[in-house]
Regions:
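The feature captures the beta-strand-to-loop junction immediately N-terminal to the Walker
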Residues: 33-35
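ABC ATPase NBD coupling module
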Residues: 64-79, 100
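Conserved ABC ATPase "signature" region
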Residues: 105-122, 173-174
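Conserved ABC ATPase signature
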Residues: 126-130, 134
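A short, proline-enriched helix->beta-strand linker immediately N-terminal to the Walker B motif
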Residues: 145-149
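ABC ATPase "signature
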Residues: 211-212
């Protein structure tokens, strides 16, 4: 379980997050919803460890991670722009992180992810030969081979349309279910949050407005 207790964060003296407390259960999909500038991306970055809280605690499975550096938390993120390597093909992108941690996923586990995300026919392609939805699937596969404790997604569907968006939503749900993986998503789209998530966290002006199941929002 991920627990945030009384998290506060300011930039240049301006409060961005104010007394944020919440719990996210193992295997749960939670969307952080709110307008631009409300603090949702800052909250994602605090969980990941890119920035530190001014006060409060971040705990995972009972361990205090508040001052634990990002690389030791075991959480991974898929950024909005995918951050793929243009000079590498799809397979090389997926397995890039295994260069430094070769034993973290077996060849069979990598192959399973490739099939789960429908990337088998694209493995030898360059990144510039892929559609937006295909790039998103490559970014998901690259993150998943590292076996994150928590998967963080920053606006994963914002650049996608129609059928492609629904396909990626289904794959995110499948990943969370198959791997019992806690998944936290930042979005500005209410429909996306309500149809993708087990619970939705609505932030307004740096505070929690609602945190509930979609049917209760």
């Amino acid at each position: 379980m991920l627990e945030l207790e009384h998290i506060q964060k300011s930039f240049d003296g301006v409060p961005v997050l104010k007394d944020i407390s919440l719990q996210v259960a193992d295997g749960e999909i939670v969307s952080i919803l709110g307008p631009s500038g409300c603090g949702k991306t800052t909250l994602l970055n605090l969980i990941l460890g890119i920035v530190d809280a001014d006060s409060g605690r971040i705990c995972y499975d009972g361990q205090d991670l508040t001052r634990t550096p990002m690389e030791k938390r075991g959480f991974n993120i898929v950024f909005q722009d995918y951050a793929l390597f243009p000079n590498l093909n799809v397979l090389q992108n997926i397995t890039y992180g295994l260069r430094n941690k070769p034993g973290i996923s077996t060849k069979e586990e990598v192959e399973e992810l490739i099939d789960l995300l429908g990337l088998r026919e694209h493995l030898s392609k360059r990144i510039d030969q892929l559609s937006g939805g295909q790039k998103q699937r490559v970014a998901l596969a690259r993150t998943m081979v590292m076996k994150p404790k928590i998967l963080l997604l920053d606006e994963p569907l914002s650049a996608l349309d129609g059928v492609i968006k629904e396909s990626i939503k289904d794959r995110i749900k499948t990943i969370a279910r198959e791997y019992h993986l806690t998944t936290i998503i930042v979005t500005h789209d209410p429909e996306e949050a309500l149809t993708l998530s087990d619970r939705v966290l609505i932030i307004e002006q740096g505070t929690i407005s609602q945190y509930a199941k979609p049917e209760e929002i």
